[in-house]
Design a protein with these regions (language model features):
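Short loop/turn segments that connect beta-strands within beta-propeller blades
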Residues: 121-124, 162-165, 226
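Structural motif
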Residues: 64, 114-118, 152-161, 200-224
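Mid-length scaffold segments of soluble, non-membrane domains
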Residues: 123-155
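Blade-terminus and WD-like Trp-Asp/Gly-His loop motifs, strongest in beta-propeller folds
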Residues: 96-101, 134-145, 184-186, 190-199
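Acidic/His-rich structured neighborhood in mature extracellular/periplasmic domains
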Residues: 95-132
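Conserved blade-ending motifs and adjacent loop-strand segments that build the rim/top face
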Residues: 171-189
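Beta-propeller fold detector
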Residues: 128-135, 167-177, 222
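Terminal domain-start segments
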Residues: 1-109
Length: 227
């Protein structure tokens, strides 16, 4: 676990599109709670998981490396870089679906030794990059992102807020150095938000990450907003 995190502070003279971030030590439990639970509770809440993404990739298809997103005020285009480009300039986009409750398209972006997710507003066409595919909470005002850092054998985690205009703002981002997501190839099935508003994550100690999946000692975390 980490004891402190870094989070963003917006200067008074900064506009909403231009943030300046500063390092400041704050306790993690200022924002979230993390609870180790047993497998029985995890499986029980898995029956109450919330499906908030509409996977409609058959409706929006990539053609010749180009994805076109129809928005009310504009058409938004995402184009992959050519294969003969320098590796450092590599960009590859995949349409994932949409989150109808906050009026966003979702794309996953792959780059040279990096990846993220892109949320595109279906009205304005304005895009916002976030850590990874999000987990929207039932209040529709917050979302978590969690993604494994394979090279560092750690886990990156972030919390975002959503205002009335559906604008996304990052509250904090941190790295957990002692645990990894269990079975990273199936995170879509194993990590979920329940109706009770908590994120449920199977985890393992980082030292077991490269072992065969059957030998990994899986535990379960329940992550929620600080009340």
């Amino acid at each position: 676990m980490v004891k402190y995190i870094s989070y963003g502070i917006k200067k008074e003279d900064s506009d909403e599109e231009n943030y300046e971030y500063f390092e400041k030590e704050v306790h993690l439990d200022k924002f979230i709670t993390l609870t180790l639970i047993n497998e029985e509770e995890y499986l029980k809440e898995k029956n109450n998981r919330i499906g908030f993404i509409t996977y409609d990739s058959l409706n929006i298809k990539k053609k010749d490396g180009v994805i076109v997103l129809p928005c009310e005020e504009s058409m938004v285009v995402y184009k992959d870089t050519e294969e003969d480009n320098e590796e450092e300039e590599y960009e590859y986009y995949t349409y994932v679906g949409q989150i109808e409750s906050i009026n966003k398209y979702i794309l996953s972006g792959s780059y040279y030794e990096a990846w993220d997710a892109v949320l595109v507003d279906k009205k304005t066409g304005i895009s916002e990059k976030i850590l990874d595919i999000p987990y929207l909470l039932p209040d529709k005002k917050h979302m978590f992102c969690i993604t494994p850092s394979l090279y560092e054998e750690s886990t990156d985690f972030s919390l975002y807020s959503i205002n009335e205009a559906n604008k996304i703002e990052k509250i904090f981002e941190t790295t957990f150095t002692k645990w990894q997501c269990y079975d990273v190839e199936n995170m879509k099935d194993t990590i979920f938000v329940s109706k009770n508003g908590y994120l449920y994550v199977p985890v393992i100690h980082s030292s077991f990450f490269w072992e065969d999946i059957d030998k990994k000692q899986c535990q379960y975390l329940k992550i929620g907003l600080k009340k």
